[in-house]
Amino acid sequence: MYREIEFQGKFEKIKSCECIGEFEDEYVYDLEIDEEGYDNQTFFANDILVHNSNYINFGAVMNSCEFDYDPFEFVKRLNEYRLKEYIKKCYDIYAKKWNTDNYQDFELESLSYGGIFLGKKKYVLDIAWQDPNKDLFPKLSKIKSTGIELAQSGTAPFAREKLTFLLRHIFEKGKNFDIREFVKILKEIKNEFKVQKADQISIGTSVNNIEKFIINDTTKFEVGKGCPMHVRAAGYHNYILNNSKYKVKYSLIRSSEKIKYYFVKTKSENENNVFGYLNGSYPYEYAPPVDFDEQFNRIILDPINRFVEAMGYAPLSPNLLLVRALF
């Protein structure tokens, strides 16, 4: 399951261990090491390499040989008749250098019409083909996201829907993408955002350590140093409920429960700016008003700006005005 000589005593360095599939009675995991120098290590389970993928752009290769036919057929044949055997030989040479057998294999898993990469394990792809399928998926029919808001269970329903729509728009336009047109679409989405119910635009999460960070939620609202935002949101709910007439109808939020939370309007920077509530139990009688501008910035504008910047554009401002570069 791991290379014992290199990693003995290093288990405390493991950042995450994620099950990525089940194979009959066996399991395969993806391990991530949070330590400089161990980022490129490989892990094996049942002789299957489960750590790291490599994405390659074959556009320059195709242009260099003036290939005018199906690009996906080109890549498949290039892999089958040239790359597959070449990579195997390279692994064999590397293994021989270290006097060991080669157990690594590099397989073609998927082809994409396009992709945007934000960083390691943070990307979105417009999948065209995926092993073991024989046929291509229609363009924009299979969007794969990893490490971004679309892949996170706590993303607000409205945000998930609109981020998917915006990313599809980017892929559809391709080289014809127009940032001005994109801003107009965002403005329309923001107008629609402002009439949504809180449940549709709130962030979902589990909450713990309420007792640790919430110092006082009865006579006044006090939080401890380093209190996470979602814990503060839960504590603020309890404070308002404790000082209301609805303690029979609604329950206090306890550690290990699932909540949703959103940003609220405040009169000063010193006031608490987040409010949470139990999943499926929005307390409309005492819930403070949503700060729609801040909530929009956090769950839609900030995530989409990361893609805008990755495409080479300046990030869009909260007022959704284009800022021209001076130089």
Task: Mark where each language-model region is.
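Autoprocessing domains of the Hint superfamily
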Residues: 1-52
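DNA-dependent DNA polymerase catalytic subunits
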Residues: 53, 58-327
